[in-house]
Amino acid sequence: MSACGRKALTLLSSVFAVCGLGLLGIAVSTDYWLYLEEGIILPQNQSTEVKMSLHSGLWRVCFLAGEERGRCFTIEYVMPMNSQMTSESTVNVLKMIRSATPFPLVSLFFMFIGFILSNIGHIRPHRTILAFVSGIFFILSGLSLVVGLVLYISSINDEMLNRTKDAETYFNYKYGWSFAFAAISFLLTESAGVMSVYLFMKRYTAEDMYRPHPGFYRPRLSNCSDYSGQFLHPDAWIRGRSPSDISSDASLQMNSNYPALLKCPDYDQMSSSPC
């Protein structure tokens, strides 16, 4: 993988992480996950009359039509005690939504940690482990978010299946843009996590490629040994003796066993033969 491609992938993973974190933060803090509308069907001309309409988030519900129009309440306290809801289905849906609320929060926390570690890893490229850890946090964030989305959808579908059908009333719902932001954030977060892990694998492989093998050099005998330098060079390692070396050693041994030099009394020169 070229350096240019690695930089482009690093930049792309950072952009995906920023976008995913921003979209999830907006989705968690806004109240447009779900739109609910409840009314009656007029028998004269089969037209509909809206009795109650609202939009809901993870924390609040705001009424768009009905007696409480323009007012917002928390999910725990859907409306004042002296008010009446048109149907119990709306109350049950809003209560079941609370079971999915912790998962987007955990996802947001994991995504923030992964974003911080990813930026530190980009600032210090030699710390390749940070890219791997940030990728794991991004993947965990995406998994937590998708679990929350599945629970959110299943809670609404279960209530719709258990709802008593009535020919004179209708109950409609649709998902809002906050829910869409959370779904897009899941895709971006998982993509950022996969790219971060891929970058870690490439950097780790490149480090191993240029790292010398530990068995290439032999250890030195000592700092003061005359033979310690030869262990730094593979060419100077001990090899088998050649036949020429063996013959040279044999000739030296024969010369050493020759009779000692004798001195003749009549001459000043040295001779090897007896006088």
Swiss-Prot record:
GO terms for cellular component: AMPA glutamate receptor complex; glutamatergic synapse; postsynaptic density; postsynaptic density membrane. Keywords: Cell membrane, Membrane, Postsynaptic cell membrane, Synapse, Transmembrane, Transmembrane helix. Its main location: membrane. It is a multi-pass membrane protein. Pfam families: Claudin_2. InterPro entries: CACNG_subunit, PMP22/EMP/MP20/Claudin, VDCC_g5su, VDCC_gsu. Brain. Enriched in Bergman glia, as well as a variety of neuronal populations including locus coeruleus, olfactory bulb, lateral septal nucleus, interpeduncular nucleus, and the CA2 and rostral/medial CA1 regions of hippocampus. The keyword Lyase does not apply. It is found in: Membrane; Postsynaptic density membrane. GO terms for biological process: calcium ion transport; regulation of AMPA receptor activity. The chain crosses the membrane at residues 8-28, 103-123, 129-149, 181-201. Regulates the gating properties of AMPA-selective glutamate receptors (AMPARs). Modulates their gating properties by accelerating their rates of activation, deactivation and desensitization. Displays subunit-specific AMPA receptor regulation. Shows specificity for GRIA1, GRIA4 and the long isoform of GRIA2. Thought to stabilize the calcium channel in an inactivated (closed) state. The L-type calcium channel is composed of five subunits: alpha-1, alpha-2/delta, beta and gamma. Acts as an auxiliary subunit for AMPA-selective glutamate receptors (AMPARs). Found in a complex with GRIA1, GRIA2, GRIA3, GRIA4, CNIH2, CNIH3, CACNG2, CACNG3, CACNG4, CACNG7 and CACNG8. Interacts with GRIA1, GRIA2, GRIA3 and GRIA4. Belongs to the PMP-22/EMP/MP20 family. CACNG subfamily. This is Voltage-dependent calcium channel gamma-5 subunit. It comes from Mus musculus.
